[in-house]
Amino acid sequence: MQPLVGIIMGSTSDWETMKHACDILDELNVPYEKKVVSAHRTPDFMFEYAETARERGIKVIIAGAGGAAHLPGMTAAKTTLPVIGVPVQSKALNGMDSLLSIVQMPGGVPVATTSIGKAGAVNAGLLAAQILSAFDEDLARKLDERRENTKQTVLESSDQLV
């Protein structure tokens, strides 16, 4: 299947976090591609990836990065596709540096920013699916079912309080 979501990350060390976005897309049967695209080590490749994403059929890009975390913003600067930034937790500042770098974009270059780490990657996968579901009723139904299942799990969790 043609990938609809591009998942990019600054290095392989970001995979521990970013795989959770892939898990969500797998669960919802949304096709995606995943690549290491470094804003600092492979800037030309990053520009090419962003500039050609639309013509390759990509509809949403999820970009995960830690530290300076320039990947989401620089990707957004080179495409008008929706870009979702995932701050990867860093050792130095627990991901706060990544979060602030991604969320503080100048007006005119939006990046939808999620929370730090695993929860952020999960939410990025869900947000990408929700964006696509605006044009895909089957995907919208799957998201509704997932939300209902989550609700039931929470309601049933009270039974564990013994």
UniProtKB/Swiss-Prot annotation:
The gene is purE. This is N5-carboxyaminoimidazole ribonucleotide mutase. It comes from the Bacteria. HAMAP family: PurE_classI (MF_01929). Pathway: Purine metabolism; IMP biosynthesis via de novo pathway; 5-amino-1-(5-phospho-D-ribosyl)imidazole-4-carboxylate from 5-amino-1-(5-phospho-D-ribosyl)imidazole (N5-CAIR route): step 2/2. Catalyzes the conversion of N5-carboxyaminoimidazole ribonucleotide (N5-CAIR) to 4-carboxy-5-aminoimidazole ribonucleotide (CAIR). It is an enzyme of class 5 (isomerase). Its EC number is 5.4.99.18. SMART domains: AIRC. InterPro entries: PurE_ClassI (IPR033747), PurE_dom (IPR000031), PurE_prokaryotes (IPR024694). The lineage of its organism: Bacteria, Bacillati, Bacillota, Bacilli, Bacillales. Belongs to the AIR carboxylase family. Class I subfamily. Gene3D superfamilies: 3.40.50.1970. It catalyses: 5-carboxyamino-1-(5-phospho-D-ribosyl)imidazole + H(+) = 5-amino-1-(5-phospho-D-ribosyl)imidazole-4-carboxylate. Pfam families: AIRC (PF00731). GO terms for biological process: 'de novo' IMP biosynthetic process. Keywords: Isomerase, Purine biosynthesis. Substrate binds at S11, D14, R41. One of its GO terms (molecular function) is 5-(carboxyamino)imidazole ribonucleotide mutase activity.
